Structures are given as C-alpha cells and as structure tokens.
Amino acid sequence: MTYILILFLTYVLHLLLKLNWVCTAVVLVFLLVMQHFHRIKGQRFQEARKRFLDVSLYIDTLLYSFLKEQKIIRAFEDVKSTLADGHMKETVSRAIDHMMLTFDETEVFVDAMRIIEDEYKCNRIVNAHEFMAHAEYYGGDIKESARILLKDKSAWERRILRNIEDRQRMFHQIILSVVTSVIISGIILYLPVLSIDISSNIIVQILSAALIVLDDLIILWGQKFLEVDYLGIDLLPEDDKHAKKLEEYKAYNPAKELRASILMAVIPALASAFLLYTDRQWPAVAAMGAALICLNQHRIGHRLMKKNLIADVKSAFPKWLMDLALLIQSENVQVAIQKSREHIPVILKEEVNTLVERLDVEPESSDPYHRFLDCLNLPEINAAMGMLYAVSIGNSGNCGSQIDELITKNLEMLDVADTARLKDKTAGMYLLFLAPVITASFKMIVDMAIFLISFLSYKVV
C-alpha cells in the first residue's frame, strides 16, 4: 500500500511541476528510499511515546499498591499483573526474580529496583524507588510522601502529554507548509502568458526536483523532534560547565569587564574616525555602531548570562524543593537540607553547600534562608525559602498546612518552568515550518527570472 501511495504521489508531482520523465524517475527513486527512513522515525516516535506511557502507568500502580500493601515485593507483583506484555513487563519480571532468588545481598530491593532504573532513565522512577526503600527499611507514615510523589507525577504526565500533542500539531503544520509550497510552485508553471512554457527548461526541471528533495528532508528533520526521549526531556544538564554558571555570575567584575570592553572598542572607534575624515559617512556610522556594541558588550553579556541563569535556576529550584519536601516528612528541615545534596541539580550545589554552612553557624536564624540565591533576587524563591524557614521553626504550630502550601506553590513553579523549557525545545519546529516557504520562494524567483528572459526573447523575435 505504501508503494502504491508513493507512485500516486510521484505522478501528482509529475503533473503539478511538469517534470520530465527523467526527473520523475529520480523523484520516484528518492521517495522510495526516503520512505524507509520516515518509517523508522515513525516507529521510534511510537516507541518513545509507549515508553513514557508505560512508565506513567508503572509509577501510578507501584505507589498505589505500595500504599495498600506497604511491601515492595507485593507492589511489584501487582505492577506485573497490571502491565501488558512488553519490555516494561519483562523488566519488572527481572526485578522480581532478583528479589525472590537473591539471598546473599543486604540491599536486595535496591539492586532489584536499579534494574528498572537502568532501563528507564527517569527521575520520577528513582524518587519512587528511594521512597519505597526508605519506608521498607525504616517504616513510618508513608501516606503524605506518596501523595507528594503522585501529585508531582500527575503534573509531569500532563506536561509531557501536552508537549507531545504540541510537537505532533507542529509537525502536521510543517507537512501542510510543504504541501502548500509545492502547490504554489506548481501554479507558477501554469500561468497562461503568451503561451510561454518554461517547464521544459533544464534549470526549472532541476529546481523542481531539488524542491521535492529539500521539502522531504524538512519533513524528515521534523520527525526528529517527535522521536525524543520523553522520559528525560525535562532533565537539567549535569556537566561541569553548567555547574559553574552561578559562580561565574557572582564573580562578575564590572570595572574589569569595562576595561576589556574599552580595549575592544578602540579599533572600531579609530576606524570610524578615519572614515569620517575621508568623508565616508555610512561606513563611519556602521563603525560607530560596532564601537558602541564593543563598549557595552560586557553589560549585554552579563544580562544575557543572568537571563539564562534565571531560567535554569527556576527549573532546578523546584526539583530540589520537591526532594526537600519528601525528606521533611521524616526529618527536620536542617537535616533534610543536608541530605538533599545527594540528588541536587548541579547548578544549585555550591549555593546549597553554602546554605548548610550558614545553618551550622546560625541554626535558628532566618538570615541563611533569606540569603539563598539573593544575587538573583527572585521573589518566588525568596517566598519559598521564607516558608521553609517558617516550617523549620514550627511557626504557628501548623507545620502540616505550611508544608502543603509549600508543595502546592512548588508544583506551580515547576510546572511553569518546565513548560517554558519544553516550549523552548520545540522552537526549532517553527523554523522548519518556515523552511518550505524559503525553498519555494527561491524556486519561484528563479522561475520568474527564466520566464522574464523567455518573455523578452519572445518580444525580440
């Protein structure tokens, strides 16, 4: 059926773009080859989407079952019976076998759950497993922690599903843009002007075939935005360069950077003076603009650094606060902050270490909380740290409601930050939506030029 559709599409393109049979054969061979790559990318998208849905069902079933049974092995058995046949069920079966058949290890459950974590790289799975392992070994009230994890998971699921829908919608728009550009390019060849037909021109034929090739490659590129790993799409970078961004921002020295900017501005300033002296005013204006940019490059760079840093911090802070909220269920705030360093986003690592050091010196003071990330002056973070301090001192004797409010605000912050990050990651699809316009415009310009030349030749004759 696929090959019949390709033959039909090729014949339509042959008629629409007035392709000769040689170019038609080239287009047919190209489309037959490319359909293999399109099929592979389509399958990868379906697999990535299924992996996400499997993980979503796994976390839900696991946590609800653990709340009911309060035993890891029983929770996993319930998950296995719920899942449909597939890779996730096979992985859960291997984890259960490890639990049942291993007798010489002290952390059997942890090692068994790591089997699933290695197959599905997802922070929500790790958080659920760590919560279950802690509850299994140490006991305690698990309802509140499970509720936090389930709320976070539900918000995460909604974000990713919404992002998948956005990507599919934008991909369909790319296809529509391609179809429209090809149709418009074909219409030009049917303009009834003096019976002039430029379609037989070799340049027009080559450009028509090239248009089809480029537009198909645009569609293939668009498919790359669909086949991403949706389990890790919202993960933050963990490299050393990312870890040092906050320290580099704090180390900014305006006086030193100004001196560097002045040195950079000397050459374009001298060039501007020389151009004015030689009465070349427009080049002099361009040189003046370059000098002004060089003179202010340190300010521009610092503002861009702050903008990017704020975006990263707004994504990292709610993730750290979520881990903190889980730890607070069984620890006091100061101990929870110390333990949270194990999974903290790298961009906050040094700042949290500084917070711990300040709390060691002033455990009852609000100053360490208020000085956290004070260099960025973000109201939402300041408010969250103020609430955290109130919880630490047990203000008003109602810590439960304060923690609930903290979690609610944190989930809102996380939703806004991650939604913005996911939207930024699909920005390239908008450029692909515009790409067929560029290819079609170029072909139309060349076609009109050839038409004009043919028209003038016709008039001369």
Regions found by a protein language model. Name each.
Residues 19-24, 28, 45, 86-90, ...:
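Long, mid-chain structured domain cores
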Residues 60-79, 117-166, 174, 226-241, ...:
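Hydrophobic alpha-helical segments characteristic of transmembrane helices
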Residues 219-250, 300-305, 452-458:
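Junction motif at the cytosolic side of a transmembrane helix
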Residues 17, 108-117, 188-207, 277-283, ...:
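Membrane-interfacial helix-loop-helix connectors in multipass membrane proteins
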Residues 3-9, 151, 157-220, 264-270, ...:
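Bilayer-spanning, highly hydrophobic alpha-helical transmembrane segments
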Residues 87-133, 146, 351-359, 365, ...:
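Long, solvent-exposed extracytoplasmic domains/loops
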Residues 204-229, 284-316, 381, 391, ...:
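Alpha-helical transmembrane segments and their immediate juxtamembrane interface regions
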Residues 22-107, 237-256, 269-272, 276-359:
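Juxtamembrane/interface alpha-helical elements of multi-pass membrane proteins
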